[in-house]
């Protein structure tokens, strides 16, 4: 939800509107921009069923996630966004093996495919795939649950968006304070 009454947010949006309208490509970022002395604070993966389409198998996203982890950046994922974490595989295994997360539960997706975002049935179940790779889902409902495990910040559903934003901001500010 865009806070239309917040002048600071509206100014920030206007300042970055050109970037929002013409974002850079993930491929270009993965090839040219990733450095150890980055000014980036985090990788953000938004939610929605779209995070299940193309991103989990995207080699460039995998490179970005592995780079972010290696350089000490946080990764933030909301709702179905953790599906994209599946791209973080390397010769050493799955990057998030052993992590605990909040994510939109398969049980809810299985009850509501007729109102989902995808045309047709779900192609696969997010929690099921992540669990098979060693990730533990700690929420059972599509609620406002949020969680931090190491440098991974997750939120369970759209209902978690406000708490997720607060937790992400607090977590990133702690990192900034520690680096000052």
Predicted features along the sequence, with ranges:
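Extended, subdomain-level signal for the structured scaffold at the beginning of enzyme domains
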Residues: 1-71, 75, 83-180
